[in-house]
Structure formats: structure tokens, C-alpha cells
């Protein structure tokens, strides 16, 4: 009987999940996005971020992981080998503090099947390109490289790799901030999405169109005794997506032809907030945004590149009796320092509801967020801008919750009229 149930389970897993391109639903995908992370570099009791990368298919697969700063400058990449139905858990503190990368290996680097053992129904094959790379010899990041990574993710100058330039925002603390992408690939790639050959139409580059990856993540703060979790953003590939589509990696692909084939994210959202009562810690919005430019390291004297901070089309805050407040926002680029609120200025951030960045006098309700913004990037899709929004609510030392915002609009079809606002008086 056990074998019968296992056969039925595997049959279900082998069947393709129902998915609609341009909705960013929670189904196996070719790219995963951890929209925001935090890691306290000095305290083991401080905040850290955990994530998992999982394989939904029986076929072995390679995943290429890229760590980006909160201004979308890549600072580290590595590969993870997954046997069929495999799971790889990662604590970002292990990487960013200790310099240790996940230990995995394909069959050619693991002939005794002790590093990445396979199950009875899982494929385990050799990726010859991984020879000399996998498994990593930890600590894989030496002191020089680790200093570069930590400096980049805390807004400090990186002398060795970036010539003394900066690549992130200096928040005045030792919390590493940024985001992570994970792509299905067909070799142990050592390049980034903007490199020639990383993408090819129909999944013919290093990155493939295998919609088999899924995962989740947790923010854990031992010192404050709480954790929140959510699924990663699952970004599907579809070979029919091209030049007329605002794809996820559109700002990077050659000649802006959409050859990454990845669906775009949302531009308009609805999200609940609680700013009082038992949730004494309030609500924070965690956002990822696409500046629509391939970012480069910049002079630390500038604080950030010229087209930041990022503004938005409209923010409307409702209470539970449909009363509303409309914080004045910024609609030109770059946002003048005195031009209304700028709650989501960077590519990845945490914003406290009720703070000066996102003010409201209400305690409970929901927010309408139209995060379209014209800044000169990807002019063929102006004013569309893709984003992701989540919310975390907590009561310090007692309990916490986290969940994704509701997506009201999506940029994939490239329809520039997709710019809804709420009539306010």
C-alpha cells in the first residue's frame, strides 16, 4: 500500500501545475526572488534571513544564486545542485558572516553520493561544468572577499573589487541589506544576468526556462523572539514573451528584446496594515522595485545614483470605515528632498507604516499602492514599473505574521495604460 501511495504522489508531482503568465502565482518557476533580506553582521542574536531552494521535478537541476545590494548591484554569485525533489536550506548569516556557501555536488563531483544524496525516485546526474567548483571548500569567501561583501551590503566603499566605490545605501548600522535572485541554469555559471550569453531566447543561454524551482523564506530575530515567513516570489518563464513584454530582467537583456522570457511583476497593490492594538510592533512594508536601469558602483560622495530615490504614482491609506488619507508623493525623477513622501526610494527596503516615510493617523485598514514611476528607464513601457510588496506585523517578544500584498496590476503585457488611480477629493 505504501508503494501505491508513493506512486500516486509522484504522479501528482509530475503533473504540471496550473499557472497563468503575468499573475506571478505560487507555482514552480524558472526564477525565484527573495525580495528583501536583512542580516545583523555583528550579533548572533540579531536579525537574519533564511531561505530554501527546492526542486519540484524528478529531474536534477542547477540553480544560480545572485546576491544584490539594495540598489541592485550584484556582489556575489554561486551555484546550488539539486537532485530530483531536492531541498536546500540557506541561512544568509552563514554566507555573509562566516563566508560559507551551500555544500552540494552533482554526480561527477560526488561519485559516492554522500554530498547530494538522491532519493529512490530522484535523478542524480553529472554537470561536467561544475568540476573544480562544486563542492565549495568552506569558508569559500576569504577575508578580503568577505570584507567586500559586507561593505557593499552596508553602503560602505569596496576598495578591492569596486575601486573604492559604493554599491548600496548606508543606513548607519551593521545590518546587511539587499535581495537575491535564483535562476534555473544548465551549467555552473559564473556570470550575471547582464552578461552576454546568460540569457538566450527560448532558454538557450546559461539560464533555462525550466519552471521547476520553488521556495520560501523566513526573517528570524532571536533577540526579539519572533519570526515571519512567506513564499519566495515565483517568476515563470514562457518562450512566447519577448520584445513587447516588460519581462523581469528586461533592463539587462541585449537590445532590450525580452530574451530572458521571465514574466514581469506587479505595479499596483492592495495591502493590509495594523498600526496599534495587540500588534504593538506595528506593520512594516517590505518592497522590491525595478529602477529600470542596470546599476553600477558609484562614488560614495554621491550617496546614491542620480535616478534615485524612486517615487510612485499614488498611495491611498484607508481605515476600516472607508475613510482615507492621501500622503503627498513624488512623481518626478529624481525626487526633490522636499517633494512629499518617498516611502520606497530604493530597490529593496523595509518601511514602517505610520513613520514619517509612510504617515497615517489610522490604526487599522488597507493601502492602495500604485508604484508606477517615470524615471527615463525602459521608455517603451513608461510609466510602468515592476515591484513586489509584502507586509510583516509583530508584537515584540510575543508573536508576528507576514504575507504578500494582493496584486491588482501586472506589467508583463507592457500596456502603458495600466496606471489606475483612486479618485480622491
Sequence positions of predicted segments:
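Sec-dependent signal peptide recognition
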Residues: 2-10
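N-terminal signal peptide c-region/cleavage motif recognized by signal peptidases
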Residues: 14-17
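A structural motif detector for short, solvent-exposed N-terminal "entry" segments of globular domains
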Residues: 20-54
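Beta-strand-rich interaction surfaces with strong enrichment in secreted/lumenal proteins
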Residues: 21, 77-80
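Asparagine-centered strand-capping/turn motif at beta-strand->loop junctions
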Residues: 52-59, 69, 304
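Primarily extracytoplasmic ectodomains and periplasmic/lumenal surface modules that are beta-strand-rich
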Residues: 57-62, 71-72, 97
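Short beta-strand and strand-turn-strand segments in soluble, beta-rich domains
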Residues: 66-78
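Long, compositionally biased low-complexity segments
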Residues: 80-82, 88-425
Amino acid at each position: 500500500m505504501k508503494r501505491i501511495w508513493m506512486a500516486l504522489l509522484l504522479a501528482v508531482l509530475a503533473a504540471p501545475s496550473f499557472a497563468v503568465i503575468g499573475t506571478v502565482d505560487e507555482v514552480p518557476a524558472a526564477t525565484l526572488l527573495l525580495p528583501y533580506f536583512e542580516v545583523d553582521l555583528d550579533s548572533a542574536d540579531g536579525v537574519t534571513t533564511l531561505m530554501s531552494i527546492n526542486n519540484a521535478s524528478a529531474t536534477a537541476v542547477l540553480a544560480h544564486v545572485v546576491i544584490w545590494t539594495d540598489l541592485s548591484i550584484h556582489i556575489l554569485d554561486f551555484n546550488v545542485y539539486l537532485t530530483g525533489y531536492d531541498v536546500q536550506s540557506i541561512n544568509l548569516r552563514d554566507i555573509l558572516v562566516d563566508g560559507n556557501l551551500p555544500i552540494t555536488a552533482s554526480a561527477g563531483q560526488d561519485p559516492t553520493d554522500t554530498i547530494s544524496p538522491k532519493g529512490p525516485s530522484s535523478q542524480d546526474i553529472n554537470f561536467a561544468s561544475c568540476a573544480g567548483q562544486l563542492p565549495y571548500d568552506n569558508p569559500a569567501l576569504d577575508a578580503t572577499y568577505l570584507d567586500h561583501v559586507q561593505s557593499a551590503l552596508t553602503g560602505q566603499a569596496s576598495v578591492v573589487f569596486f575601486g573604492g566605490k559604493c554599491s548600496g545605501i548606508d543606513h548607519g548600522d551593521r545590518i546587511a541589506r539587499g535581495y537575491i535572485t535564483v535562476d534555473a541554469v544548465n551549467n555552473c555559471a559564473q556570470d550575471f544576468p547582464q552578461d552576454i550569453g546568460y540569457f538566450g531566447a527560448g532558454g538557450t543561454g546559461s539560464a533555462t526556462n525550466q519552471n521547476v524551482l520553488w521556495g520560501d523564506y523566513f526573517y528570524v530575530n532571536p533577540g526579539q523572539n519572533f519570526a515571519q515567513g512567506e513564499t519566495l516570489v515565483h517568476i515563470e518563464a514562457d518562450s512566447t514573451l519577448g520584445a513587447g513584454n516588460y519581462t523581469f530582467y528586461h533592463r539587462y537583456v541585449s537590445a532590450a528584446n525580452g530574451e530572458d522570457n521571465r514574466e514581469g511583476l506587479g505595479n499596483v497593490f492592495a495591502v493590509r496594515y495594523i498600526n496599534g492594538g495587540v500588534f504593538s510592533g506595528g506593520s512594516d512594508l517590505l518592497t522590491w522595485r525595478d529602477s529600470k536601469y542596470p546599476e553600477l558602483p558609484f562614488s560614495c560622495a554621491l550617496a546614491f545614483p542620480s535616478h534615485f530615490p524612486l517615487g510612485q504614482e499614488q498611495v491611498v491609506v484607508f481605515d476600516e470605515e472607508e475613510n482615507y488619507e492621501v500622503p503627498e508623493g513624488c512623481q518626478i525623477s529624481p525626487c526633490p528632498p522636499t517633494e512629499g513622501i518617498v516611502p520606497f526610494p530604493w530597490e529593496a527596503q523595509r518601511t514602517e507604516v505610520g513613520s514619517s516615510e509612510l504617515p497615517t493617523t489610522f490604526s487599522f485598514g488597507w493601502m492602495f499602492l500604485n508604484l508606477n514611476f517615470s524615471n527615463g528607464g525602459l521608455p517603451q513601457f513608461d510609466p510602468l514599473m515592476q515591484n513586489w510588496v509584502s507586509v510583516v506585523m509583530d508584537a515584540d517578544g510575543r508573536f508576528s505574521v507576514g504575507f504578500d500584498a494582493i496584486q491588482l496590476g501586472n506589467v508583463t503585457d507592457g500596456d502603458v495604460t495600466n496606471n489606475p488611480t483612486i479618485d480622491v477629493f
